[in-house]
Amino acid sequence: AHLGVLKAFEEEGLKPGFLSGTSSGGLAAAFYAFGMPLEEIRDLGDKLHWLRVSTLNVPRLGLLNNSELGRFVEKYLGSKKIEESPIPLALVTCDISTGEKVVLKTGSLSQALMATTCIPGVFSPVQEGERMLVDGALVENVPLTVLKEMGASVRVGVSLGSESYRKPENMIQVIINAINIATDQTNLASEGKFDFILKPQLESYG
């Protein structure tokens, strides 16, 4: 969905001046910010599977460790710093030990992407100094406030709200449903505060 919006912008001759993201949107934003063509990003997305880019984690602050995702990112983009992106980029995470929103605009890109996609309970938090970082969707699922701070005059967000939930069949699906419910409530509370929120219809996918 994120890539479809970017493609529509390109077809209209529009190019974002700033990009922000969390979760899968953070991955899409990062690869695009570093200049990867949309078709290549889509192909990478087809190769990416959480259980193939994770390893069993012991001792467990999460069932899995997503360090393999970091290696996946570095394989295709190299050992980049966030601040090196041609399009200014911000990745939103949450410090699970304090509940604080943590916006990453500098530092290791692969480490930041591990953090912003870190589903709490499924993946172990990513250690960043004293902070324990997880998926920023917990605090701002459509991270547009940071774009204003970066200087954007018009902000366009893509919301992948769950809206409908599937009956969970295992522990991981229970955790994901719980997070989706929480982030959907965050989305509702944020509506009306931004310039444009796009809500692609995804019911027929997945």
Show the residue positions of the predicted features:
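Patatin-like phospholipase
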Residues: 1-22, 30-206
